[in-house]
Structure formats: C-alpha cells, structure tokens
UniProtKB/Swiss-Prot annotation:
Matches recorded under InterPro entries: Rad18 (IPR039577), Rad18_fungi (IPR004580), Rad18_UBZ4 (IPR006642), SAP_dom (IPR003034), Znf_RING (IPR001841), Znf_RING/FYVE/PHD (IPR013083), Znf_RING_CS (IPR017907)
Keyword Nucleotide-binding: no
Any Gene Ontology CC annotation: nucleus
Binding-site positions, Zn(2+): 190, 193, 206, 210
Region described as Disordered: 222-254, 407-487
Comp. bias (Low complexity): 409-420
Entry-annotated residues carrying Phosphothreonine: 155
PROSITE patterns named in the record: SAP (PS50800), ZF_RING_1 (PS00518), ZF_RING_2 (PS50089), ZF_UBZ4 (PS51908)
Linked residues for Glycyl lysine isopeptide (Lys-Gly) (interchain with G-Cter in ubiquitin): 204
Pfam families: SAP (PF02037), zf-C3HC4_2 (PF13923)
Catalytic reaction equation(s): S-ubiquitinyl-[E2 ubiquitin-conjugating enzyme]-L-cysteine + [acceptor protein]-L-lysine = [E2 ubiquitin-conjugating enzyme]-L-cysteine + N(6)-ubiquitinyl-[acceptor protein]-L-lysine
Keywords: DNA damage, DNA repair, DNA-binding, Isopeptide bond, Metal-binding, Nucleus, Phosphoprotein, Transferase, Ubl conjugation, Ubl conjugation pathway, Zinc, Zinc-finger
Name used for this protein in its record: Postreplication repair E3 ubiquitin-protein ligase RAD18
Amino acid sequence: MDHQITTASDFTTTSIPSLYQLDTLLRCHICKDFLKVPVLTPCGHTFCSLCIRTHLNNQPNCPLCLFEFRESLLRSEFLVSEIIQSYTSLRSSLLDALRIPKPTPVPENEEVPGPENSSWIELISESESDSVNAADDDLQIVATSERKLAKRSMTDILPLSSKPSKRNFAMFRSERIKKKSKPNEQMAQCPICQQFYPLKALEKTHLDECLTLQSLGKKPKISTTFPTESNPHNKSSSRFKVRTPEVDKSSCGETSHVDKYLNSMMSAEHQRLPKINFTSMTQSQIKQKLSSLGLSTNGTRQNMIKRYNHYEMLWNSNFCDSLEPVDEAELKRQLLSWDVSHNKTPQNSSNKGGISKLMIMKSNGKSSSYRKLLENFKNDKFNRKGWMVMFRKDFARLIREAKMKIKTGSSDSSGSVGHSNDGDGVEKVQSDQGTEDQQMEKDQDTVINEDRVAGERNLPNEDSTDADLSRELMDLNEYSKDPPGNN
C-alpha cells in the first residue's frame, strides 16, 4: 500500500472537527508524521524512536521542553504503538463516514413534490376485495401515474397520510406469515433440545431426529420458529432477544492489535549496540569493527564513524523498541540508501600515494580519455587495455623498483650468512656488498635517466603492447622466485 501524506486538518471539514486534536496528538513533533516505534522520554514526551535518537546525537535534550537526558533513558511504548496502528488502519473509513455531504442543486425543470403532488397508494375497493380474497389475501399495490389517477375517482384512492381502517390494515398481512403463525396450532417443548415445535411435528419427526443426533454425539439442530399465541413465553423471549454479531478475530484489526499488545515483551535475541569512542581507535580498528558487523569499510575515517553511528541508531530503534522488527538485511539496505545520500566520499580527497592522486597527476594532456576511463572505473565496463596504455610508464617504473628491492633483499640475506664464517669470509662478503652497492647506484642512475627521458617524451611508446607489459610482469615473478644472489 502506497504511503499517503495526511494532515490533521482533514477532520476540520467533518461533522466532528474536534478529532483534529486527536490526530495531532498521535503525530511525532519532529517528523510531523504518525509515530513510528514510539518511545517515552524521562520528561514524559513521546517521539519516534529513530527521530529522537537522531536528535540526541546533535543535541542531548528534549525538543519540546529542552530537558537534558541520555539516550539510554528512552523507554518503549507498546500500547501507544498499537493504538496508532489501529487508528491509522481505520482513519480513511472514519473520514468517509464523518464527511458532511454537499447539497446537490435541484435542476430548474424538475418539479419539487408538494402536498398536491404527493405519492398515493391505490387500494382495491370492497367489492373487488371480496372476489380477490377468495383466491389470495396478499396486498395489491398498483403503481399509478398522473393519467391513471385522473381516470380513477377520488373515492377509490387513499392518500398515504390518511389512517387506514381495520379492514384495510388487515390486507397488509402476508399469507406466508399467516401459515406459520396459526393461533389454533398447539406447541410443545422438546425435552432434548428445549425448543418449541408444533405437537404433530414433534411427535412424528423431531423426536427421532434429536435422539439419532444424540446417539451419534452431535448437537441437535436448533430451528427458529415463529412465536404463536399458544406459546407466550417464547413470544416474549424472542421479542426482547438482541442479536449480537460474532466478531471475527482474524479479520478485525482492533483485536489483532490488542493481542499484540498483551503478548508484547522485550526481545532478548538481539543485544543493544553500544556507543563507541572512536578517538582512541586507529583506522584499522575501526575497519575491523565495521567488518565484524558486515558493514562497508570504504571512505575516510570520518565516513566510517558516521556509518557506524547511523547503523547503531537503526539497530537499537529496530530491535530494542519495535514490536515488529525487520531483519538485518533490511537494516543494511536502509543504511546503504542513507550512505549514498548523506555520507558521500569527497572526490578531491588528496590521499598521499593513493590511486586518486596518481590518476589526477596523469590526467594532464589527456583529460578527455582520462574522464572517459574514470566513468567506468568501478564496474565491469572498465577499459583495462586503455588504462594499461595510459599508465604504462608507471607500471614499468614500479617493476624496476621491485626488481631492485628483490636484489637488495637477496644481498642482505647472503651477507648475514657470510658473517658466520671466518675472517676471510667476512672480507669476501664485505667486498661483495661493496660491489652490489655500486651496482645498485648504477641501476638507480639508469632508472632516473630513463624516467627523465620518458618525461621529456610525455607520451607512451606506441610500439610497446600489453603483451610486453605482461612479459615484464612474468619476468618479475620468475625473478622474485630465483634472484641472482642465490646462484
């Protein structure tokens, strides 16, 4: 069902405009909508659970009386919750029943009935009724028009306002009612079902039916009979008997709300999420906390803190205050929707050494292609080949730096092994170390010169392909497995 925006002023045009106050009292002072999961503050005011928790994050006081209190002092109001749900379910029907109907304008050409143009009931005359009563006692009402009324004499027409005689009033009786209420028929009470039946019907059929049903363990059939003059007790009891319609508890909304309130209790299945002081936590600890709850760890430190704080409000409002909590998947869906609209990561964040800074640095001179690649950077349509061509020089430089680090690590490990030998071995290791240092200096000079030459070109080499870059990566992998220092 679609959610419709309603206001308390809808009742001002009804026959009971004072219901405007009731409708206003059942609304939250913060969101102006009907209370959802209402909670009670220590100062006695009621708000939506999520609304007041969000307000307390900014200002630790009541929005109405400014009384200061903590979030842990909020208490659930199950009764108010069911009252509001019951009221909202019948609000539209109540409005329809209380709306004052607008007077419909009467057309000018339409005649308004007056005393001279009132409706008439035509009754048959005494001579005609004698012949009709022999066959049927039913009342004959004949629809008459103005032409037929003109032909008839006024003595044969009786106005509706006139009082009929005893003989005419007797004509209103139905023949079916006469058959069922014969005054001379003797009635008797069944000793099994305690119901009154005609004596002949009781002796012939009813007693056998009651005895048969009683032997089978079934309840006897109770048939309704018309009261007769021979059974005054039955007549008086049926006159004052009031039919009370049975209430279907499954279809009546009020009954279900009452049952939910009577069976309400605090659920111990989910524990309350605590407030966390993030000032003493590192960024890795914050990520670990979010990962334990199944939340995203993207964004800056401040983004992750805001994400946890909002999820804590959703969790406690749902599992600690609501009678009908939703599952965790729905809470995470609500968090994702909030994260997209309220917790955006700034595009111009300068993370030192990060991929965003590198992408901005390399976008000079090729901004159009860079922006085109950046549009699909985080989905399956990302052009990897174009990305490798754009940043080919950086990949090559990183590969060379990795090779140099592998050489440095292998020389350090061989030097530590050589220290365990005698003095000659130490001198040999030191000479080898000096040779390696000289070689590293030469390699670094070579890398610097290559970077300088590549910077002067300012364009990637068109002859190199993705296969060349892949071969360099494979060579680096083999080089890391079997470095030259191990030979």
